[in-house]
């Protein structure tokens, strides 16, 4: 019973940290990274298809992404999808290869992005604390129904607090790496 609650809390906390990582990948740093275009979908035979299924995206250098399109007819559609995205990118095509130069980030924009990243991290911390609260509520319910002793309840709450501390440390580490990445010129 207690182990199930702890395992569930640990799994949910891990998912929260992973969700934060996925959220932060979408925030553009000064460096070219293929995952930057993961959120772009292209109209293909009447369905919105992820760009990575229609083309190969690689970082040509630190400031340029190269997109090799599998079907030449899709090149203009892919260019349009990139321009319509809110990433502020301006693709240039050369046959089946589309080059996407990344403009350098201004100091002000970097600071804005750091604020956004910190806000995302805080939302991650709140999610972790909510998971802890839910797990503790489940333990209290077991205690109230006399399914576990007060000692077991206390030990389990301590264990859940340790899981919470580890998850929050993971979030802090992810935040620190992303902030450093953003402020690097």
From Swiss-Prot:
UniProtKB keywords: Cytoplasm, Protein biosynthesis
Coiled coil region boundaries: none
Main localization (coarse): cytoplasm
GO CC list: cytosol
Gene Ontology biological process terms from the UniProt entry: cytoplasmic translational termination
Domain of life, source organism: Bacteria
MF (Gene Ontology): ribosomal large subunit binding
Subcellular location: Cytoplasm
Function statement: Responsible for the release of ribosomes from messenger RNA at the termination of protein biosynthesis. May increase the efficiency of translation by recycling ribosomes from one round of translation to another.
NCBIfam families for the chain: frr
HAMAP family in the record: RRF (MF_00040)
Assigned protein family: Belongs to the RRF family.
Name of this chain's protein: Ribosome-recycling factor
Organism: Photobacterium profundum (strain SS9)
Phylogenetic lineage: Bacteria, Pseudomonadati, Pseudomonadota, Gammaproteobacteria, Vibrionales
